[in-house]
């Protein structure tokens, strides 16, 4: 059985990179520009809300579709 992600699920940088196909530099540049919120640091680990990742991905797709 595979776990289904909820809007408040936490995802890491590896997940975001795998899901978008972009590398660390691209992702961190998007954080600097404000397109992706900064990660929440929880017990020394950087995590994003799945909801924030989805919004970020939708922004990328809408820009690509013009």
UniProtKB/Swiss-Prot annotation:
One of its GO terms (biological process) is DNA recombination. One of its GO terms (molecular function) is DNA binding. Keywords: DNA recombination, DNA-binding, Repressor, Transcription, Transcription regulation. It comes from the Bacteria. Gene3D superfamilies: 1.10.238.160. Transcription inhibitory protein for the torCAD operon. Also acts as an excisionase and plays an essential role in the defective prophage CPS53 excision. Interacts with TorR. Binds to the effector domain of TorR. This interaction, which does not interfere with TorR DNA binding activity, probably prevents the recruitment of RNA polymerase to the torCAD promoter. Binds to DNA. Belongs to the phage AlpA excisionase family. This is Response regulator inhibitor for tor operon.
């Amino acid at each position: 059985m595979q776990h289904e992600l909820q809007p408040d699920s936490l995802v890491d940088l590896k997940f975001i990179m795998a899901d978008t196909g972009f590398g660390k530099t691209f992702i961190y540049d998007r954080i600097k520009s404000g397109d992706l919120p900064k990660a929440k640091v929880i017990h020394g680990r950087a995590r994003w809300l799945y909801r924030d990742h989805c919004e970020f991905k939708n922004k990328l797709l809408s820009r690509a579709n013009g």
